[in-house]
Amino acid sequence: MNRNILSILFDELHVKYTKKYLSELIEGHPYKYNLYGFSQILTMYHVENKGVQISKDDIELLDAPFIAYAGHDIVVVKNLTREKIEYYWQRRWIQSSVEAFCEIWDGIVLLTETSSKS
């Protein structure tokens, strides 16, 4: 079974889940391919989340992990410093400069925070 974006994010957030149930939940969701659907599933797992669009100049203000829309796809950002970023895209982890990431990123993110119920 291929890992999906939400299982990658849940691992980074240390959220308990089963791969089978999460996969079934995603497959049955009408908005499984966009941030709205991801937000609904995160809420089901008691992960607080909020979709925002920010200026690329403010990327360093974000706390990883989070979901971002980049390269016409959805990615999970694992680590972020002023100069480097590490993110999961197209089934692999990529490390690049923040500047290079900002060239493919449109400024849209889904910020996440776990709770005691997550």
Segments predicted by a language model, with ranges:
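Noncatalytic regulatory segments and standalone regulatory/sensor domains
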Residues: 2-13, 18, 26-33, 59-75, ...
